[in-house]
């Protein structure tokens, strides 16, 4: 061995770091899986996220249904306005009984789609089963046959607008064949500017045949029955509501007048 090689070997022997260069140190192996503390931390984070997201998702779903219901009100109102443009007056729906000034009037839910439904028949020109309107054309109120004398179809109600007769949903069995909003609510008020003065007014002096505003209930309660207050629906002396047609209903969980969904608000 040459002196230079011997010197290099001697230096490597004297320098253990150089001798071990290139050899990776062995790291202690980490146990597989999570520790109890890590699992509890993850569970806590999931709980916090769920508490944030679930109410947000529910609120978003409710807001979407409210928007859809407003869209329904707009379509129904447009059909009624088309009727007025065709005949020169607004149609008359129910004028007495529990269904006074209601979309479904006094029509009971069920499988008999030939039973008179004034709102549907007047705007569609047929019965709910598609058969032709028959019977008297005069009366009080005037039957649909005497109002839509040309049998013009002003609107086409879809399944989203009506509870199917074939439904097996126990909460909807008593509402079969009735018009509904996006919350499956069938208790919906409808008011029109009967005297064509540009606004809808209630009271005996209002001129629109609306003595009092109809009370409506949410689909999940029969004990809550409310109508708009005078802030939302001004009295006749205050000018009423500037509109030709208005609708309102109470969404689920509604308990006060501020919860009402009103087409003009």
Predicted feature residues:
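Asp/Glu-centered strand-loop micro-motifs enriched in Gly/Pro and often flanked by an aromatic residue
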Residues: 3, 33-35, 167-168, 174
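N-terminal leader/signal peptides at the extreme start of proteins
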Residues: 1-34
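N-terminal pilin/flagellin-like segments and related low-complexity appendage regions
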Residues: 70-265
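Acidic/proline-rich low-complexity IDRs
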Residues: 24-26, 35-39, 52, 99, ...
């Amino acid at each position: 061995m040459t002196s230079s090689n011997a010197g290099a070997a001697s230096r490597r022997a004297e320098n253990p770091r150089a001798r071990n260069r290139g050899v990776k140190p062995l790291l202690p192996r980490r146990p597989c899986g999570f520790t109890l503390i890590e699992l509890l931390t993850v569970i806590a984070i999931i709980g916090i996220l769920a508490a944030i997201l679930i109410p947000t998702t529910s609120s978003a779903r409710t807001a979407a249904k409210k928007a859809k219901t407003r869209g329904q009100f707009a379509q129904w109102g447009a059909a009624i306005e088309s009727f007025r443009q065709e005949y020169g007056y607004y149609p008359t729906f129910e004028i007495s009984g529990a269904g006074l000034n209601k979309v479904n009037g006094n029509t009971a839910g069920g499988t008999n789609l030939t039973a008179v439904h004034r709102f549907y028949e007047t705007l569609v020109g047929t019965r709910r089963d598609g058969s032709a309107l028959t019977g008297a054309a005069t009366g009080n109120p005037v039957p649909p046959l005497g109002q839509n004398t040309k049998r013009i179809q002003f609107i086409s109600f879809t399944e989203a607008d009506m509870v199917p007769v074939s439904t097996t949903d126990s909460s909807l069995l008593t509402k079969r064949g009735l018009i509904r909003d996006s919350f499956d609510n069938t208790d919906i008020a409808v008011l029109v500017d009967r005297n064509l003065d540009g606004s809808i007014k209630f009271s005996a002096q209002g001129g629109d045949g609306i003595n009092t505003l109809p009370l409506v209930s949410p689909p999940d309660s029969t004990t809550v029955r409310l109508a708009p207050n005078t802030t939302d629906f001004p009295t006749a002396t205050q000018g009423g509501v500037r509109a030709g047609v208005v609708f309102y209903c109470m969404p689920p969980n509604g308990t006060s007048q501020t919860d009402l969904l009103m087409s003009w608000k």
